[in-house]
Amino acid sequence: MTIDEIIEAIEKLTVSELAELVKKLEDKFGVTAAAPVAVAAAPVAGAAAGAAQEEKTEFDVVLKSFGQNKIQVIKVVREITGLGLKEAKDLVEKAGSPDAVIKSGVSKEEAEEIKKKLEEAGAEVELK
């Protein structure tokens, strides 16, 4: 398989499939896909404050409630997770329990995107 063929295959992936690919590559090769951040020299007094503002990088998307539109929420869960109908239904019915994790270890951007999709379907979602 040539590099061009690999790129073509990657172009056909969905956002959730790309996120899964990145996660697997990070695990396989022990690297991170996070963009390097340029850090300016901070004054000594500001260094302690900067450490306190460290932001969480991995989030779990937890379903708190499926609301009034359970069927639509199940469809969105299937789209996000790739689960079958029964598995997605079982997951949605766990709403409110600690086991109702739709996706774990995702970036803030992906977690927000998943939350938005689920809320549009009528679900109540929490990011942990």
UniProtKB/Swiss-Prot annotation:
Q: Which HAMAP family match?
A: Ribosomal_bL12
Q: Mind naming one GO cellular-component term on file for this protein? A: cytosolic large ribosomal subunit
Protein name as it appears in the record: Large ribosomal subunit protein bL12
Keyword Transit peptide included in the entry's annotation: no
Q: What does this protein do?
A: Forms part of the ribosomal stalk which helps the ribosome interact with GTP-bound translation factors. Is thus essential for accurate translation.
Query: MF terms per GO, please?
Result: mRNA binding; structural constituent of ribosome
In Pfam terms, one family for this protein is Ribosomal_L12_N
Question: What is annotated about its quaternary structure and interactions?
Answer: Homodimer. Part of the 50S ribosomal subunit; present in 6 copies per ribosome. Forms part of the ribosomal stalk which helps the ribosome interact with GTP-bound translation factors. Forms a heptameric L10(L12)2(L12)2(L12)2 complex, where L10 forms an elongated spine to which 3 L12 dimers bind in a sequential fashion.
NCBIfam families recorded for this chain?
L12
Keyword line: Ribonucleoprotein, Ribosomal protein
Instruction: Detail the disulphide connectivity of this chain as listed in its UniProt entry.
Output: none
The similarity annotation says:
Belongs to the bacterial ribosomal protein bL12 family.
The family database entries (InterPro entries) matched by this protein are listed as: Ribosomal_bL12 (IPR000206), Ribosomal_bL12_C (IPR013823), Ribosomal_bL12_C/ClpS-like (IPR014719), Ribosomal_bL12_oligo (IPR008932), Ribosomal_bL12_oligo_N_sf (IPR036235)
Source organism per UniProt:
Thermotoga maritima (strain ATCC 43589 / DSM 3109 / JCM 10099 / NBRC 100826 / MSB8)
Where on the tree of life does the source sit, at the highest rank?
A: Bacteria
- Which processes are annotated in GO (biological process)? translation
